[in-house]
Structures are given as C-alpha cells and as structure tokens.
Amino acid sequence: MLLYLYILYIALKTVSHLFFCNPCFRNLSVGDMLNPRLSLSFFTNHLLCPEAPLIIRGKGSYSAVGNFFSRKK
C-alpha cells in the first residue's frame, strides 16, 4: 500500500511539473491533455522540447527559485 501511494505521488508530481512548469506546454487546456492523440504528442514533444532545461524560468514564476534564476540573466 505504501509503495502504491509513493508511485501515485511521483506520478502526480511529474504530471503537475509537465503541465504547469514547462513553457512548451503551458498553453494546453485540460481537454487537450485528456485527448489520447494529443497526449501522445504532448509527451513526445516534451522529450524534444528545446526549452525543457528552462522550465524554472517560466512566465509568471513567482517562486523563490524562479525569481533567483530569472535575475541571473
């Protein structure tokens, strides 16, 4: 049971990171994410996304880490 909860936690953290932090996919709607065809292209594009290393510096990032890295430009 504990292993199941840990796997669920990792999955939710990964999904939230992809959907809300990555600038390549921030504009996708929930309907787009739930569409099986777009979901496949979503995860394929995530691997090929040129901005993937820059996920911390997204627009509207108010976190301390995001502000720290955006000031170092």
UniProtKB/Swiss-Prot annotation:
Protein name in the entry: Uncharacterized protein YGR035W-A
Top-level lineage group: Eukaryota
